[in-house]
Amino acid sequence: MLTLLLVALVPVGYFGYPLASTVLSLNHGTVAPGSGSLAAPGGAAPAPRGTVTVLLMGSDERHDKNGNVVAGDVAHSDTMILAAVDTDRKSVRLMSLPRDLLVSIPGYGPGHRINEAYTLGETNHLQGGGPALAVRTVEQLVGVQIPYYAVVTFDGFRQGVDAVGGVTIDVERPITDHDYPGDHFDLIPVYVPAGRQMLNGERGLWYVRSRHDDPMSDFGRNVRQQHFLTALSAKVLKPERIGQFGQFLDIVKNNLRTNLSPAEMLALGNAMVGTSKPRIQSYAVGPDLVRDPTPRQFALYGAVLIPNKTAIDSLVRAFLRGDPPPGGATPSPSGA
C-alpha cells in the first residue's frame, strides 16, 4: 500500500535521478506520467514553506496475471493518510483519516463517506480519476492544498513486504477477523496471534487491514498501519538491505499510481539525506475528533462518523507545524 512510496523516497535521495526515473517509469498504465501537481481549489491554503503534502492511498484494485485490472472490479481507497514531508526538519508527518468520515465530495455534495470519493472518480471516469477527486475531497476537509497523490495496490504491499523478508511487529492483541475481505469478492477468516513475530506480505496485510475484531475499529487499524509503516521503513533503509532495493523498486514501479515526477520524487528523497532513519510523526483524526450520527443521520447515511470541524482544524495546524496534537497527546516519532 502507501508504505511503498514513503519507503522509496529516502534511497531515491541517495541514488539520484536515474533511480527516481526507474521508479516512475510507465508500466501497464499504473503510473500517471508527467501529470504534474494538481490544481488546488480556491478555498485551500498552501502548506507552510518547506512542507510538501502528499495524499497516500491504499487501493483494493486487483489485477490478473498480465497486470490488467480484473473485469468488473470497482476500486476503493481502503486507506487514506495525508503525508507532510518537512524538508527543513528532515521528517515525515502522517495523519490518518477514518474511512467512514462523513464529508462533502466536490460535485456530489454532502452526505458521503470520505472513501467514496476515490470510487466515484474511478467509476464515473472523471478527469484525474479517483485520486484527483479524493485529493479535492481531503483538501476541502483540511483546508490545505495537496498537490500530489500516490496510490499503491494490496498486491504491491504483499510483494514489497516479501521482498525485504518480512517485517517484525509486536502484535499487542490477537487479531481474529471472520469477515476479512478476500481477493475474490468473498469474506475469509484470518488470525494473527499476539506477540513479537515476523509478518510476511500476506499476514502483514491482515495486520494493517483488519478492523472487525478491533475494539477501536478503524481507529485501531489506523494505529496499526502507522506502526507497520515505521517498522518497514526502518528495515528497508538498513545499509545491509541496499542490495535488495532494486527488487523493491521493481515492485513499487509495477504497483504505483502517482503524479509525482522523477524530479519531484528525487527532491523528496533528498529531504531525508543526512539522517540514518526517517523521523516519522503520527497523527490521526481519532475518536475524540468525531461523534456518532444522530438517529436521523444514521437512517440517512448508516454508521458514519460526524467530524468535529473545529477540532480537526486544530489538529491540522499542529500537523503542519510538527507540534504535539491538541489535548496534550504527543506524536509518535520513529527513529528519533
Where are the predicted features?
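Non-catalytic, solvent-exposed segments at the cell envelope interface
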Residues: 1-336
